[in-house]
Amino acid sequence: MKITVCGKGGCGKSTVTTLLAKELARMEKKVLVVDSDESNFGLHRQLGVELPRDFTEYFGGKDKAFKTMMTSGILDSMKLSAFAKKFFSEDFAMADIPEEYYSEKDGVKLMSSGKIHKANEGCACTMNSILEQFVAHLTLAEDEIALLDMEAGVEHFGRGTDNSVDGILMIVDPSFESLRLSAKIADLSTSIGKPIWFCLNKVTEETAQMMEEEVSKHGAIIGRMPLDHDLGLAGLTGTELQMTIAPISEMAQFLIQ
């Protein structure tokens, strides 16, 4: 199963992704987390692993990877491995991913499509195109799950990355923007025939009813995460998330049923 985790900036995508990944691993699933946000440098810390090498480096970096995708026949002339050539046209398994491009701990693998490391290096289009190819050709066994921690917003829908996933999980925080975005993401998910699920995050007694009423108009709410002081502190300090939270366990059970 391949699942997109999306939402507005700051809604808690990486936090929920991390907690879900760890819970699914405890359920004896083999989990792959794909860091799809070129500006996020904290997901690996939440998982308690080193930041993996940018996957674009496997294809010689952003410039060479771009030429590979845009120029017909260049694959035959480039010094790429068999997997790199197969990547653009054939299906592959989680076990085929080169081990130097992921970090791993306690049954969870983390890989990164790429990061912006310096000014004027160019946009993230190449990284996003490679991500689209990766998701399209990745095949998973029954006991394997991939969680795609997307960048904020809806651009991944425009690129077509979500065409190859099995479901969309949107994280909704208590903000007007997030509530409005839930309607848009529901429409986009429906338009490509993908199920849409929602996780309410940072919920308090004051916000619970309004969030529930608004979001439930657009799809099933499968998780309700209360505002949590310990999670907030861990996010501030960049420490590994090791807590077990009941709503996360419930969401994990829902996803694998």
Which functions belong to the PLM regions below?
Residues E23-D106:
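N-terminal phosphate/diphosphate-binding loop that engages ATP/GTP or pyrophosphate donors
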Residues V33, V108-L110, I221-R224:
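Conserved beta-strand scaffold positions in the cores of enzyme catalytic domains, especially
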Residues G235-I245:
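C-terminal boundary of histidine-terminating zinc-finger modules
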Residues K2-S36:
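Walker A/P-loop phosphate-binding motif and the immediately C-terminal alpha-helix
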Residues L19, R26-M27, C125-R224, G232-L233:
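Conserved catalytic-core segment of NTP-binding enzymes
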Residues K79-A152:
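Phosphate-binding/switch loop-helix module in NTP-utilizing enzymes
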Residues S36-S39, K202-T204, D228:
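Residues in the short beta-alpha loop(s) of Rossmann-like NAD(P)-binding domains
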Residues P247-Q257:
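C-terminal alpha-helix
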